[in-house]
């Protein structure tokens, strides 16, 4: 990759150079570690002091933060890349420097891979060692499937998708263009569907065949060891642009709206529909058959047990952390709230009765 100049990065990202546009940028680094020739960024005012002290070749900043630096008298003689959104600008520049994306130009099918004769694998694809691609599977252009991957019968993988080692895409499932699936991801395993057959001797759970698919849209990224189950009859759908973190469970028949992000260890029960542009915190969990409105934010660890119909809300159900002894005392109070409520209600009734009895006669 040719080393870009600060001016080139500004042009590519709609930013403005304050300083030397011909400065060669050799890499990216945090504010407190960046050296000459390296680019860093400031997107959180908590790190303003680090920006003031930084030895970076250049720093991505907002116009407002650059004025704060100037007010401290530390802007002159340094290089700045002024962007409307420094964090987004940094992300786009980082894509340019991403070694994994820019150096893996391999194509072809490794001799140790197994590809069904009728599978469609364009010459621009790379199929790594021990990959298995079953009958009728169709891959788009420039797909990369790394070691030990599995693509089931009649599954479809879109253009420019990247499947890291040990990813499994079950039969008939769909992965969209430019998707990134990290190691251990499983797309399209059976949903947790069993019909209880109750008798005098107990309960037998009869398996319900899961005949739907799991369908991922374009530009979806799924973190390591996440499972997205196939639908029971209809499909499980992850719409375009969703980003799902590690160890997330998406159950059968769930639909996740476009550009929603879900942090690690969250779990979504069957047939729940999450709207577009939602933000789901880590370890949040959702009961089944719910509807969650667009642009909803759910804090980490929150349990959602009812539908949310109003867009744009922020919901939290986690008890804040405290020193252990204080938490135990508060927990004891919480356990007694129902009895305390009964006492308050009884007291209110008694006070109302006393008030009624003390009013003067109208005779």
From Swiss-Prot:
InterPro entries xrefs: Hexapep, LpxD, Trimer_LpxA-like_sf, UDP_GlcNAc_AcTrfase_non-rep
This protein's record includes keyword Mitochondrion: no
UniProtKB keywords: Acyltransferase, Lipid A biosynthesis, Lipid biosynthesis, Lipid metabolism, Repeat, Transferase
Superkingdom in the source lineage: Bacteria
One cellular component term from this protein's GO annotations in UniProt: membrane
Transmembrane helix as UniProt keyword: no
Pathway: Bacterial outer membrane biogenesis; LPS lipid A biosynthesis
Entry EC number(s): 2.3.1.191
Positions annotated as active site in the UniProt record: 252 (proton acceptor)
GO biological process, one term: lipid A biosynthetic process
CDD domains according to UniProt: LbH_LpxD
A molecular function GO annotation: N-acyltransferase activity
Catalytic function, reaction form: a UDP-3-O-[(3R)-3-hydroxyacyl]-alpha-D-glucosamine + a (3R)-hydroxyacyl-[ACP] = a UDP-2-N,3-O-bis[(3R)-3-hydroxyacyl]-alpha-D-glucosamine + holo-[ACP] + H(+)
UniProt xrefs under Gene3D superfamilies: Hexapeptide repeat proteins, MurE/MurF, N-terminal domain
Coiled-coil residues: none
PANTHER family: UDP-3-O-ACYLGLUCOSAMINE N-ACYLTRANSFERASE (PTHR43378), UDP-3-O-ACYLGLUCOSAMINE N-ACYLTRANSFERASE 1, MITOCHONDRIAL-RELATED (PTHR43378:SF2)
Family affiliation: Belongs to the transferase hexapeptide repeat family. LpxD subfamily.
Oligomeric and partner information: Homotrimer.
Protein purpose: Catalyzes the N-acylation of UDP-3-O-acylglucosamine using 3-hydroxyacyl-ACP as the acyl donor. Is involved in the biosynthesis of lipid A, a phosphorylated glycolipid that anchors the lipopolysaccharide to the outer membrane of the cell.
Name this protein carries in UniProt: UDP-3-O-acylglucosamine N-acyltransferase
Species the sequence originates in: Cupriavidus taiwanensis (strain DSM 17343 / BCRC 17206 / CCUG 44338 / CIP 107171 / LMG 19424 / R1) (Ralstonia taiwanensis (strain LMG 19424))
Gene: lpxD
């Amino acid at each position: 990759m040719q080393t870009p100049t600060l001016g080139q990065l500004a042009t590519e990202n709609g930013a403005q150079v304050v300083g030397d546009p011909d400065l060669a940028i050799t890499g990216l680094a945090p504010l407190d570690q960046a050296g000459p020739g390296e680019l860093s960024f400031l997107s959180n005012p908590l790190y303003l002091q680090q920006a003031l002290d930084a030895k970076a070749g250049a720093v991505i900043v907002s116009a407002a933060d650059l004025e704060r630096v100037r007010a401290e008298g530390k802007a002159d003689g340094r290089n700045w890349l002024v962007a409307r959104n420094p964090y987004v600008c940094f992300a786009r520049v980082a894509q340019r420097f991403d070694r994994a994306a820019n150096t893996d130009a391999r194509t072809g099918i490794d001799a140790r891979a197994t590809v069904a004769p009728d599978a469609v694998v364009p010459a621009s694809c790379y199929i790594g060692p021990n990959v298995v691609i079953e009958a009728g599977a169709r891959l788009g252009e420039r797909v990369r499937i790394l070691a030990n991957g599995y693509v089931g019968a009649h599954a479809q993988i879109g253009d420019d998708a990247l499947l890291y080692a040990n990813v499994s895409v079950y039969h008939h499932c769909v992965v969209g263009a430019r998707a990134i699936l990290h190691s251990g991801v499983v797309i399209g395993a059976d949903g947790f569907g069993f019909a209880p057959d109750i008798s005098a001797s107990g309960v037998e759970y009869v398996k319900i065949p899961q005949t739907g698919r799991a369908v991922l849209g374009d530009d979806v990224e799924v973190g390591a060891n996440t499972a997205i189950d196939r639908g029971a009859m209809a499909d499980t759908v992850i719409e375009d642009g969703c980003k799902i973190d590690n160890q997330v469970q998406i159950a059968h028949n769930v639909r996740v709206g476009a550009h929603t992000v879900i942090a690690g260890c969250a779990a979504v029960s069957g047939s729940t529909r999450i709207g577009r542009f939602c933000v789901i915190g880590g370890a949040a969990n959702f009961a089944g058959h719910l509807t969650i409105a667009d642009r909803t934010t759910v804090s980490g660890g929150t349990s959602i047990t009812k539908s949310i119909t109003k867009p744009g809300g922020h919901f939290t159900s986690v008890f804040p952390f405290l020193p252990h002894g204080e938490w135990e005392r508060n927990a004891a109070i919480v356990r007694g709230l129902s009895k305390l409520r009964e006492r308050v209600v009884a007291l209110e009734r008694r006070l109302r009765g006393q008030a009624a009895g003390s009013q003067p006669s109208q005779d």
